[in-house]
């Protein structure tokens, strides 16, 4: 079980790829390691199913908490449903891998990446992507690789290759770029309002590093004696495509050239052409090759018709510079935006529509205890900004059962979330946990960017003080030989014909999120740069329309949103506020009808629907944590009496005791002879004993209405509220 290990010196670190040692029955396997992070990646191929017209590729990323030396917190103490982060890494693997398989491949493929050990200095996701390529090549699956991925961070003015988790949090950029020898094949990024030029420079920087990992994979293949060969595509029967081109090209072209029609009208006309063609084919002789082709495969006609429509649409764009709705290549569809469309029971709402894409977003403000706890390998323990994306069937005029979110919904929600995070206010100025839900009411392309715009509207309507509003646009690119056309704001019918689709979100200052996917084996960085730059005018145009609906965040919150007060106490006094068994903090919350959260750092957040109640709770906590000094004078009420003395609340929540001997200069037989519960008295702190107990005295302290002529000037009194 020795296997072979190849080490690569990579930006001052060593990346190790071990092959031939693990998972011997998998088609191909590699253990890819850097530091103490180890990811086992396997690729397996099985015979394809008959009658399918797509590539059945499954990419899985498995997290095991033993990788971080932890035991799962579930009842069964084992991993259950993959966390959201694992789903996003599945997509990160799938997106650069899928376009690199031959279009004719129909075999079942499964890539499984398992994080076996995690070093907080080395995130596992980009290692898993590179490992997926290596395992696929070792499995001898037809594949236009090698492919590799790296992460690029930005600390100050310097790019950092494969930064640690801590560096990612501190930096202004978190960008993953995947590439092949042909060029860039995938980009995923979150940025702190970075100019387009900086993001493009980072992509170029990352692609140079990708090239080194590609060479390493090629070296491993050579040492293993594996020659990478892409089998020729199976012979395709051209009878039906040729027939459709002659019979339908003109009529399809006429429909595509009617720019004033609606999507429904265009779809109806194309369906009519296909139905008429199907009837014509059914009228042919049984022995006719066209009818034989259609009879042999029920999907042959719709697939060939769709392919012809795609070809004609691409030709119309490349030759005439016109799209199916008559727009120019750089033109955005009509936009409408509104804020506050729902009653204020909903804390904030926004409705955004671009063409037939319509998204309703809502914002809900919560307390720190509403933060999402992360039970995964991410060092971050919680999330305070959540974005959830829903895509019901009715949004595309279809029916299907309502199920839990799939990978697509999770991915789109995460992209829109990433776009907003850089402009959220600092926690110490706005301590709310915020959840935004984007409901896609109608979909005709670019719903994720519609969710970004809807989120901005809802957050501003909720009174969240965003640093800058964010908008987003979906772009497309068609490449035919050396000719390249970039499309702004692609709609649904265009999504399937472009060679690259990418989404860009940001403010007027710069980019906050970027997602770029290819359907070809790679593009030069120069073309990617052109696409990124063309998205900026579209984003700013959309942003201008949004600002017509709401120019700045509302000054006040919804009356139904909780009111929060946040302040800091000495962390060593947290136990004083909580009290034995939580008794003290429970009494405060019950007395003031508030909700109180205390962080380990000493930050206290009080939530209440009544601002006065929150202020009362704050005064109590400040009283509990305020340092009391000997000699200080306070005015307070008698709270209880015991045989040897009386207790006085000198500060909200903080009591001291007057011993019976300190009630008067004269001898006192019974405490009640001098004071009663509820009496207001002025006391001086006589001493604080070694257990922190406050001992008070009335002796020599003038009370209300008494002369203070012979008394020394008291120290400042801390009044009760």
UniProtKB/Swiss-Prot annotation:
Keywords: Cytoplasm, Magnesium, Metal-binding, Nucleotidyltransferase, RNA-binding, Transferase. GO terms for biological process: mRNA catabolic process; RNA processing. It catalyses: RNA(n+1) + phosphate = RNA(n) + a ribonucleoside 5'-diphosphate. Involved in mRNA degradation. Catalyzes the phosphorolysis of single-stranded polyribonucleotides processively in the 3'- to 5'-direction. NCBIfam families: polynuc_phos, PRK11824.1. Belongs to the polyribonucleotide nucleotidyltransferase family. This is Polyribonucleotide nucleotidyltransferase. It comes from Synechococcus sp. (strain CC9311). The gene is pnp.
